[in-house]
Amino acid sequence: MTKPIPAASGTAPAALFGASDVRRLAEEIGVRPTKTLGQNFVIDGNTIRRIVAAADIHADETVLEVGPGLGSLTLGLLDAAKSVVAVEIDPVLAAKLPGTVQQWRPGAAKDFHLVLADAMKVTELPVEPTALVANLPYNVAVPVVLHLLQHFPSLRHGLVMVQDEVADRLAAGPGSKTYGVPSVKAAWYSSMRKAGVIGMNVFWPAPKIHSGLVAFTRREPPVTSATREQVFAVIDAAFAQRRKTLRAALAGWAGSAAEAEQCLLAAGVDPTARGEVIDIAAFARIAEARQDRQA
């Protein structure tokens, strides 16, 4: 077992979990990672340091971590941030985590806040987070990111580790073959970019695919009189039939293909274009044009 050593000025970095530590902690509480919860625990300290460095966390920040699991990433975040608030859905893991933090980072235990909850249902936290850093379960990654960006405007930036294919989708721009609903909806809240790829062998159990890092920076949504819900409805309709022209794909949303064409023309969008080539600002203009025509 790696002995936990508090960080000190001018000394080596504080110890992080190795593979044996992760397996021992899991064994102590009888946990086996489950596919249902998308659990893959990071077992490599250098990977944790890489994630924390890529997240660009400042010493005065409060970080929101989703799915801390056994605490591999949590320890690295506590070393970098002012405080960490972690949201964990698994009650067994949640019960173990405070004790782990106390053992490995006793000086930072007071700066650690744990919330036992489903991240998709969290709308309030005990402290206001300024950054999101998380190793997200592959099966809920996009909904969780969008939910947190919606409900916590204090989140100014962050870094999420997701399935590499999902990372490509989140960071894609108009015209890319991976550009779709996740890309456009994420762009409502922030600018996203691919920040790296993580191999399979740094996890336990090892997933069958690589993971991708996505960094984001909050930005204001497009200036529009349309609501977020109205804009997102256009996005959903456009990509439900992504190979069709917008005139055809938005016919159901607008009431007819002819009405869809009028909305598109009013928004300055080519009716023969497809949704995969226009940006979030154009989707907002389309939603606004529809509202104006109904007024």
UniProtKB/Swiss-Prot annotation:
Family: Belongs to the class I-like SAM-binding methyltransferase superfamily. rRNA adenine N(6)-methyltransferase family. RsmA subfamily.
Localisation per UniProt entry: Cytoplasm
Gene3D superfamilies for this protein: Ribosomal RNA adenine dimethylase-like, domain 2 (1.10.8.100), Vaccinia Virus protein VP39 (3.40.50.150)
Binding residues for S-adenosyl-L-methionine: N40, V42, G67, E88, D118, N135
Keyword field contains Methyltransferase: yes
Name listed for the protein in its UniProt record: Ribosomal RNA small subunit methyltransferase A
UniProt keywords, alphabetically: Cytoplasm, Methyltransferase, RNA-binding, rRNA processing, S-adenosyl-L-methionine, Transferase
Pfam families: RrnaAD
One cellular component term from this protein's GO annotations in UniProt: cytosol
Family matches, as SMART domains: rADc
Catalytic reactions on record: adenosine(1518)/adenosine(1519) in 16S rRNA + 4 S-adenosyl-L-methionine = N(6)-dimethyladenosine(1518)/N(6)-dimethyladenosine(1519) in 16S rRNA + 4 S-adenosyl-L-homocysteine + 4 H(+)
InterPro entries: KsgA/Erm (IPR001737), rRNA_Ade_diMease-like_C (IPR023165), rRNA_Ade_Mease_Trfase_CS (IPR020596), rRNA_Ade_methylase_Trfase_N (IPR020598), rRNA_adenine_dimethylase (IPR011530), SAM-dependent_MTases_sf (IPR029063)
EC number: 2.1.1.182
Source species, domain of life: Bacteria
Reported function: Specifically dimethylates two adjacent adenosines (A1518 and A1519) in the loop of a conserved hairpin near the 3'-end of 16S rRNA in the 30S particle. May play a critical role in biogenesis of 30S subunits.
Primary location recorded for the protein, binned into one broad class: cytoplasm
Listed GO MF terms: 16S rRNA (adenine(1518)-N(6)/adenine(1519)-N(6))-dimethyltransferase activity; RNA binding
The organism of origin for this protein: Arthrobacter sp. (strain FB24)
